[in-house]
Amino acid sequence: MEKEGVTMVINFEELHPNERAELERNIFFSTLEQLKGWARSNSLWPMTFGLACCAIEMMGVGSSHYDLDRFGSFFRTSPRQSDVMIVSGTVTKKMAPIVRRLYDQMPEPKWVIAMGSCATAGGPYVNSYAVVKGVDQIVPVDVYIPGCPPNPAALIYGINKLKEKIRYEAKTGKQVTNK
């Protein structure tokens, strides 16, 4: 009989192998950091922030054909409710301070995905005096998605890579950088 308020301590070495196998199937061992990483990776809220043609592909991810909601990601319109910024399109030098301000308004922890060749490296406008040669010059980027424009499946793949990165960092305690 187990009494209320009594904590049981089980020594695994004293258990029969069948009992040990049963306990291992039904007990989940983890650290708080790993649980937080798992929860964060499965509930990403990207901010809708499209600057050019890649934004059309980003909108496609929310359609019924791809349905990003089934992965636990819900688009938010406010940076204060978002934890992922998806920069999709050409970032001009005039737009750069706004991108930085939106990034600064996001709560911690926060991540950035650069979607398309314009956000990644300037795209076809790379030699223009008015274009930033990659959004990573303004904010730290966690995942790069190549293409002009990348299709919605590529964006879903990039979001899944970000989820893997979040879980890995929570599990190991090591920061993964792109440089």
From Swiss-Prot:
EC class of the enzyme, as a word: translocase
A Pfam family of this chain: Oxidored_q6
Assigned GO CC terms: plasma membrane; respiratory chain complex I
Compartments reported by the entry: Cell membrane
Swiss-Prot/TrEMBL cofactor(s): [4Fe-4S] cluster
EC number from the UniProt entry: 7.1.1.-
Principal location class: membrane
Annotated membrane topology: Peripheral membrane protein
InterPro entries for the chain: NADH_UbQ_OxRdtase-like_20kDa, NADH_UQ_OxRdtase_20Kd_su
Catalytic activity: a quinone + NADH + 5 H(+)(in) = a quinol + NAD(+) + 4 H(+)(out)
Spans through the membrane: none
Keywords (A to Z) from UniProt: 4Fe-4S, Cell membrane, Iron, Iron-sulfur, Membrane, Metal-binding, NAD, Quinone, Translocase, Transport
Record note on cofactor: Binds 1 [4Fe-4S] cluster.
Molecular function terms from GO: 4 iron, 4 sulfur cluster binding; iron ion binding; NADH dehydrogenase (ubiquinone) activity; NADH:ubiquinone reductase (non-electrogenic) activity; quinone binding
GO biological process, one term: electron transport coupled proton transport
Binding positions ([4Fe-4S] cluster): 53-54, 118, 148
Its biological purpose: NDH-1 shuttles electrons from NADH, via FMN and iron-sulfur (Fe-S) centers, to quinones in the respiratory chain. The immediate electron acceptor for the enzyme in this species is believed to be a menaquinone. Couples the redox reaction to proton translocation (for every two electrons transferred, four hydrogen ions are translocated across the cytoplasmic membrane), and thus conserves the redox energy in a proton gradient.
Family under the similarity heading: Belongs to the complex I 20 kDa subunit family.
Assembly description: NDH-1 is composed of 14 different subunits. Subunits NuoB, C, D, E, F, and G constitute the peripheral sector of the complex.
Name by which UniProt lists this protein: NADH-quinone oxidoreductase subunit B
Native source organism of the sequence: Bacillus thuringiensis (strain Al Hakam)
